[in-house]
């Protein structure tokens, strides 16, 4: 059995991928209170068998659920159209969507989302709970900190380091290193 924690569009995408690649029963779970106050995650952890995937696009909420669920049976979800170097081992709970390309030497942390048609070039490092938006491009040697969001169509130039919990706007071009907690957008 596979348990999807989440609802909405991203959970539907994950369900679609799993339906094509797994013959196991798929169950949906969510708790409306995770955005405000956490529900009874011990019930989920102790009483529900099978593998888990957290299908929540918001990095902070995904991390909160992972910490509270505390389950160590997370699966990685990869669409069969993604092109991934044979030596890449994404962290548990990570999700690699349709048409993404991930090159040699890249390290992907736990519970990352690499969205539709994103390109992650050689030797990149993606921190836990990071999000790479649709059609975003990370050039070679880029480092993305934990919990950082890279918006749709953004480009991060080679060997740039972006700190933890940053927000890079859609269509932006990142040309210099950014410290933790920065919101950046635009194209120089």
Task: Enumerate the language-model features and the residues they cover.
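Glycine-rich hexapeptide-repeat left-handed beta-helix
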Residues: 1, 53, 116, 125-128, ...
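Glycine-rich adenosine-cofactor-binding loop
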Residues: 1-18
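Short alpha-helical
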Residues: 9-12, 60-61, 173
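NAD(P)-binding Rossmann-fold cofactor-contacting core
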Residues: 21-36
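Phosphate-bearing ligand-interacting subdomains
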Residues: 33-85
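Glycine-rich, N-terminal phosphate-binding loop of Rossmann-like dinucleotide-binding domains
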Residues: 55-57, 98, 187
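Hydrophobic, well-structured mid-protein blocks that either form specific transmembrane helices
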Residues: 70-123
């Amino acid at each position: 059995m596979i348990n999807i924690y989440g609802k909405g569009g991203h959970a539907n995408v994950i369900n679609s991928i799993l339906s094509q690649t797994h013959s196991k029963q798929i169950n949906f779970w969510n708790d409306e209170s995770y955005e405000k106050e956490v529900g009874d995650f011990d019930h989920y952890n102790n009483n529900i068998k099978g593998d888990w995937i957290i299908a929540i696009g918001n990095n902070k909420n995904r991390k909160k659920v992972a910490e509270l669920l505390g389950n160590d049976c997370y699966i990685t979800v990869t669409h069969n159209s993604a092109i991934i170097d044979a030596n890449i081992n994404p962290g548990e709970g990570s999700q690699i969507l349709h048409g993404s390309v991930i090159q040699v030497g890249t390290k992907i942390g736990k519970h990352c989302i690499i969205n539709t048609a994103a390109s992650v070039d050689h030797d990149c490092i993606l921190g836990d709970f990071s999000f790479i938006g649709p059609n975003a491009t990370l050039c070679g040697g880029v480092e993305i900190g934990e919990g950082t969001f890279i918006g749709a169509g953004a480009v991060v130039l080679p060997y740039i380091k972006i700190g933890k919990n940053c927000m890079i706007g859609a269509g932006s071009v990142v040309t210099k290193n950014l410290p933790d907690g920065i919101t950046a957008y635009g194209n120089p």
